[in-house]
């Protein structure tokens, strides 16, 4: 990948205009073939499902066959489109998809680099671990928050139109359109969600298309927010020349001319805008009146429709008042509460006492959602009654304890910044009893017998590291009034996605 990027910097214009020629390079096909062999060998233990004889001439003939196809069902033979996420399909079609993904990734990397260099004054932090500290420091200064959901279902022509803005190679666009229409079911919400949760699935092209689509949205949205943040409060009636003012507004807001009306227009007064995103969720913190925030929501709706030709449902952009509502983001219920603060100031012989009111972030762990997830995984039922894991009885005692220990430790590590640790201790109690019942079922005895035979060190050895971490993190939180964020996104990602999916269904209903 680095080698292709270095070559692309020398011949950037050539790559954008003649990307299709790179398909016939043997270096690219060899790299894709080796990558496919390595991935298949890691997933398939018994045999490798790829032919030992790989011919570059066959790949070229396959590309020529694709160009001559008229029926979209014959792209990769008479195969089922649902086999896009199946590892048992033809190796040559796999190589074509991998080669197309590599070429698009290289061209996309060069374009995104130039875009980030062109944005001055807008600080961008790409680490997922910086989201919660940023929200804790910056969001309390805002009074409204806009919760945006990026649509998962993407039409193939919308993706092709996006790539046409920075790729001028017609054969590559035709090949991309052919693949997208042949496998359009693979870019649905379920398959994209599966690709984000389970990276083992072969969904590299789907993830790249999703990331490029989100990047295209942000490439227009971030400059728009930047212009809003640097603008001043202006009133239409204060300008003697109304046409001159409308031209200024048209320059500030980058929407088409039909969106600008001659009515009174207010921009944000002392704007304070913060933008964070993870997955399909985006949060925009705003400071202003309710009317001003509604105007921003109106602009976002038109931004989505005119630039991406996509009808955005009203429930996908929600405006919440921070002092009265909460938002569900990354597995947390986020709310802000007013906190009184007394400040004493001494000047010469006078002592002044000032009462200040500040907003404080209160992240709450969704105990009911965690309980629902444990019930779904058959650790307990909906009411909280514990159930033994019969499928784990074939494991050793150490493996059983280690699995329960890992689940409990991951939950406490991720929700170390929450303000309701008592609910997490209840989740720990629910996990302890299934662990004991599983061991008792394995040894065909009761919990008391297992405890007596194994001794008191059976459960004290388990969850020991978790107990030390809990005591240290919560004591630090209460003493120094600082939260300890340990966002292990990789391990908690399936939990966050499942809870977010439940929350989305509640919002839609």
Curated annotation (Swiss-Prot):
Keywords: Chloroplast, mRNA processing, Plastid, RNA-binding, tRNA processing. Its main location: plastid. InterPro entries: Domain_X, Maturase_MatK, Maturase_MatK_N. It is found in: Plastid, Chloroplast. GO terms for molecular function: RNA binding. One of its GO terms (cellular component) is chloroplast. GO terms for biological process: mRNA processing; RNA splicing; tRNA processing. Belongs to the intron maturase 2 family. MatK subfamily. Usually encoded in the trnK tRNA gene intron. Probably assists in splicing its own and other chloroplast group II introns. This is Maturase K. It comes from Amentotaxus argotaenia (Chinese flowering yew).
């Amino acid at each position: 990948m680095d080698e292709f990027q270095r070559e692309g910097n020398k011949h950037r214009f050539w790559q954008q205009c003649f990307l299709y020629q790179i398909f016939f390079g043997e270096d690219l096909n060899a790299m894709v073939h080796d990558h496919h062999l390595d991935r298949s060998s890691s997933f398939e233990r018994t045999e490798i499902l790829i032919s030992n004889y790989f011919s570059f001439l066959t790949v070229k003939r396959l590309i020529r066959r694709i160009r001559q196809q008229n029926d979209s069902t014959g792209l990769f033979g008479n195969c089922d489109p649902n086999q896009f996420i199946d590892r048992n399909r033809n190796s040559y079609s796999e190589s074509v998809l991998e080669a197309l993904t590599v070429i698009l990734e290289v061209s996309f990397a060069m374009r995104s680099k130039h875009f980030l260099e062109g944005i001055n004054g807008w600080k961008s932090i790409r680490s997922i671990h910086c989201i919660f500290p940023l929200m804790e420091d910056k969001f309390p200064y805002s009074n409204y928050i806009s919760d945006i959901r990026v649509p998962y279902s993407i039409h193939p022509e919308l993706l092709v139109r996006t790539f046409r803005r920075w790729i001028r190679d017609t054969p590559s666009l035709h090949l991309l359109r052919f693949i997208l229409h042949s496998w359009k079911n693979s870019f649905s919400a379920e398959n994209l969600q599966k690709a984000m949760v389970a990276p083992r699935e072969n969904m590299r092209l789907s993830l790249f298309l999703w990331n490029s689509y989100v990047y295209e949205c942000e490439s227009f949205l971030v400059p728009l927010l930047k212009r809003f943040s640097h603008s001043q409060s202006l009133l239409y009636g204060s300008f003697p020349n109304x046409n001159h003012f409308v031209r200024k507004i048209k320059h500030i807001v980058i929407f088409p001319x039909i969106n600008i009306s001659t009515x009174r227009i207010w921009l944000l007064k002392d704007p304070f805008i913060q933008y964070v995103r993870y997955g399909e969720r985006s949060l925009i913190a705003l400071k202003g009146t309710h009317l001003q925030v509604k105007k921003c929501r109106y602009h976002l709706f038109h931004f989505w429709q005119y630039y991406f030709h996509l009808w955005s449902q009203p429930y996908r952009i929600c405006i919440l008042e921070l002092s009265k509502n909460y938002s569900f983001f990354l597995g947390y219920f986020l709310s802000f509460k007013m906190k009184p603060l007394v400040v004493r100031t001494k000047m010469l012989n006078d002592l002044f006492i000032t009462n200040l009111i500040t907003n404080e972030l209160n992240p709450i762990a969704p105990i009911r959602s965690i309980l629902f997830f444990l019930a779904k995984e058959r650790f307990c039922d909906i009411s909280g009654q514990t159930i033994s894991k019969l499928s784990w009885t074939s494991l050793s005692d150490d493996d059983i304890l280690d699995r329960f220990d890992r689940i409990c430790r991951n939950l406490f590590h991720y929700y170390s910044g929450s303000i309701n640790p008592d609910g997490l201790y209840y989740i720990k109690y629910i996990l302890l009893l299934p662990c004991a019942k599983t061991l008792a079922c394995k040894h065909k005895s009761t919990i008391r017998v297992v405890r007596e035979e194994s001794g008191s060190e059976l459960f004290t050895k388990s969850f020991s590291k978790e107990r030390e971490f809990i005591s240290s993190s919560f004591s630090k939180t209460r003493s120094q009034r600082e939260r300890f964020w340990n966002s292990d996104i990789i391990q908690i990602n399936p939990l966050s996605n499942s809870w977010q999916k439940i929350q989305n269904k509640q919002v839609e209903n």
